[in-house]
Amino acid sequence: MSSVIEDTQPSGSASLSLLQRISYGSLDVAGNLLYCFGSTYILYFYTDVAGISLAVAGVILLLARIIDGIDAPIWGIIIDKTRSRYGKCRPWFLWLPLPFAVFSALSFWSPDISMTGKAIYAAISYMIASILFTGLNTPLSAILPLMTLSPKERLVLNSWRMTGGQIGVLLMNATALPLVAFLGNGDDHAGFIYTAITFAIISCALTLFAFKNIREMDTDKIQHEPKLPMKKSFAAMKGNWPWILMVLANLIFWIALQQRNTTIVYYLTYNLDRKDLVPLINSLATIQILFIIAIPFFSKSLAKTWIWVGGLLVATFGGVMMWLAADNITFLIAAWILGNIGSGIACSMPFAMLGFAVDFGAWKTGIKATGILIAFGSTFCIKMGSGLGTAFAAWIMNSFGYVPNHAQSAAGLEGIIWAFIWAPALLFALAAIPLLFFRKYEAMEEKIRHDLETVNS
């Protein structure tokens, strides 16, 4: 172990207050409420409200995805270089919520200008909003190992965060379109901008509430430390096998999750002729909240690695059960719920465990590059995996002869089954393989924490 830790933490093994836990969870309520509103309805707004062509709207969203894949590690480097009296991550919850709220709301305003001007405006406003969201989401993940060194407390905090995220999505799904109709009074353009402003105000307020109440450890020392050079940030990845294995597993998982969630509407519409079930199916996914809350209790008898692997295997099994359900709707709904319970657990675990990869890097190399390690392990995996998952789904269906807005051939229906069931199920199972090699590193967690506390004392 290196005798010099260039970015140190003091002992932080005590449990945090209920207020800090609630505040940490509120960050994901804030982020998901506003960002998911944009990601869910922006395409419809562009094409059916602003009048932008589908092809141009697709290019805008594709460019945003490309930028998303680039800006996550950049934000990680920025966080590693941040030095303030509030710490490394916490100040961003003061500096960014208002700009993020403003540009997210502006994304749902279409100025009365030429169509080319509208497209340029849409691209700029949406991309800036996406960049600012990454700027908030990256420190949200990176602050966890800076709040506490306790693996147990990190797991509890992460459960609060993931529950908050699900609440944010649930609130958005339940209120977005009713608010558009009510606030717009028949004018969709007015309805969307007023709804976006409403969500933006709530999001900004919740983020500032979290900023007020959460704390990083040892901010006085961090404030006066030299900034971590970019070269050393990347050096923290070298030989950090826990981090490498988690990044690989998490990236594969997000490809699978996005592919499954993107194609459920196609499966219900074309294979079962039950498009009316889409709202019900989407709302039932929130049942996973109950199991996310229970993760700290599972951890009392199971290693975190096995909880993550178990979630992936349950998600795989749920996919197989959906295939067996065929046109039995009750069986299908039960299998969908089961699959979402598994994916909900698997989605939660990386956020709780990436802090250990940061600790491992500090223990092994003497470099604690919290920002870039967690940016790659969380935000990059989510955004890149989601983009690849959507692309893979489209490629699979297209290769089987899928034709939009038409009755599908037998081959087209088979392609939807592969895109919705078999490819995600195989990828969920594949994501578990790197974790089989991770367990031996998790067994070192207490020793590493003790060594870091000794060095920093």
Regions found by a protein language model. Give the residues of each.
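Membrane-embedded alpha-helical bundles of multi-pass transporters/translocases
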Residues: 2-457
